[in-house]
């Protein structure tokens, strides 16, 4: 029993210590002129289901300040923005936009939004109608 208490104390102490390693996270400034332009229905879906990882308008939940969750969330957002950042869409070349739309076409049926994200943010779930609308909007039917 003493060993269990000792292990618990060390784990608790470690958990408390890692809280000192905070992620310095801020959204970059948003320039609406650089944002993606899409029909209202498409923008609604993108903002609801994609913007928390793929824009400069991330709304962090309360648990985003708890390590190690904060580290993983920061990593996911950084990776998401590298893949596509809807806040800077107009800075992409036509070729980059075309490629990103093609990837969006594929990913809305395969992996996005991530299941772990949807589990914590049920409103972000895409319906079949949402998925079809996004795919139709991209204009990237399979070759």
Region spans (language model):
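Sec-exported extracytoplasmic/periplasmic mature domains
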Residues: 51, 55, 78, 106-109, ...
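The canonical Cys-X-X-Cys-His
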Residues: 46-57, 112, 134
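Extracytoplasmic electron-transfer domains, predominantly the class I c-type cytochrome c fold
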Residues: 71-120
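Electrostatic cytochrome c docking/interface patches
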Residues: 26-46
